[in-house]
Amino acid sequence: MNNFDISFWLKVFQEKLITLFGNRIKFFGLQGSYGRGEQTAGSDIDVVITLDEVSFKDLQLYQSMLDSFKEHDMICGFVSGERELMNWEKSDLLQLVLDTKPIIGSLEHLQNLFNDEDIRRSVLTGACNLYHACSHNFLHAKDSNMLVGLYKAARFTVRMKHFLDTGSYISSMKFLSEHVTDKDRTILNIASSEFQENDFTERSRILIEWASEIITEYHG
């Protein structure tokens, strides 16, 4: 995807989306590395779409639209109806609302649904999932690629932890690293560095011990 123009691509995507769903579209946005302006050549295009309601037929139609793009294997994201979005688990929804750059519509009305307890649960859930997955991977799968993915996921727990502790939500991972604790910065630095096979044991230890501390501190 050299010389890939995300702005032009989004315009084409938006036109096709409107042709397909028209005024049923309640929200369309971009999240992930492209939304933050931190994309690399291998980054996914992470789109968020909310319709008035979503049937399985709608998903089939949307799937056909995705398949019409040569970049279809790079497109991922979140699709839901309004009702599902309004009733989504708050600690999970919070990240979506804060991290998505709007193109059509807005998610601002959802921000009033959240409180500090929802943010804490988001941090705790993220740490618990990382602890379990990293332990399982170290003991059983022993998959370096899995560990790379876990460190990427850990960045979002770092970001939400910083948000809970300071009230400041920093979208950019690069900028975030300048404002977090030393231990959190270590997680971010490892997530952005190259992995070697001999890093597996030490980096597994670092992530497990970091997640363990968060679970203990933020258990409620």
What do these predicted ranges mean?
Residues 46:
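N-terminal loops that bind phosphate or other acidic moieties
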Residues 1-19, 23, 35-42, 52-220:
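Catalytic core of pol beta-like nucleotidyltransferases
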Residues 23-31:
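Short, glycine- and small/hydrophobic-rich beta-strand elements in well-ordered beta-sheets
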